[in-house]
Regions:
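A short glycine-rich, Lys/Arg-flanked "PGG" loop and its adjoining helix->strand segment in the class I
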Residues: 115-127
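C-terminal alpha-helical "lid/dimerization" subdomain adjacent to the S-adenosyl-L-methionine
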Residues: 19-21, 133-189
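Conserved class I S-adenosyl-L-methionine
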Residues: 1-37, 51-52, 70-73, 146-152, ...
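Class I SAM-dependent methyltransferase SAM/SAH-binding core
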Residues: 43-91
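C-terminal lobe and adjacent flexible extensions of AdoMet/dcAdoMet transferase-like proteins
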Residues: 191-196
Length: 196
């Protein structure tokens, strides 16, 4: 992640409670899915202010973020099964096959190189490990025009308004297990993948 993007998210940290409130229904579904699985090692990339941390019921969680300020806030929600680290998801400092589960909650469209992020996730996941991606995805309906119109502003806030998951080569190495759509326009989705 570039210094400019990193700096932006440090400053943006004060607005995360509002963002979390807006995204709560989606995140509730995400954690319903995650918590149904057997206890395992879970990596939360872009843990942000740690709002998700209390929602993990049984997993050993490692949360990473590039924002020191966000991690400082997250540390107040810390509990003994969570390890928080300052790290870039596009350059993970973990060995191969370390995690049973990886969560990307509204992260993949804000990193500089989504392809590199997914490659790193593939590397650190164990065989049969699960990847959970909760994000907006540019749909093939009228909202596509909104995404395209929003591109210039989106760049200023370090966000890819136009985002197609199928354009990522590495995602094709995973098997899509489930797709959950939110709202009538299906702008937000939860995609659950499995590493072979």
């Amino acid at each position: 992640m570039s210094r400019q993007t990193h700096s932006f998210y440090n400053k943006f940290s004060v607005f995360y409670p509002l963002v979390d409130f807006f995204l709560r229904p989606q995140k509730t579904r995400l954690f319903d899915e995650v918590n149904q699985l057997p206890a395992g090692n879970l990596l939360d990339i872009g843990v942000g202010n740690g709002a998700n941390l209390p929602l993990y019921k049984k997993h050993r969680v490692t949360g990473i973020d590039t924002s020191f300020e966000m991690l400082s806030i997250a540390s107040k929600r810390y509990h003994k099964q969570v390890r928080l680290l300052l790290m870039n998801g596009e350059d993970l400092l973990f060995g191969d096959g370390q995690f049973d589960y990886v969560v990307l909650s509204h992260v993949i469209a804000v990193v500089d190189n989504p392809e590199q992020l997914v490659e790193e996730v593939f590397r650190v996941l164990k065989p049969n490990g699960r990847l959970f991606i909760l994000n907006h995805f540019t749909p093939n309906n009228w909202l596509k025009q909104v995404d395209f119109a929003f591109r210039i502003f989106a760049r200023m806030v370090h966000f890819k308004s136009v985002f197609y998951i199928h354009e990522l080569t590495t995602i094709r190495r995973f098997k899509l297990l489930k797709e959950v759509r939110f709202g009538s326009a299906s702008y937000f989705k939860l995609l659950i993948y499995q590493k072979p």
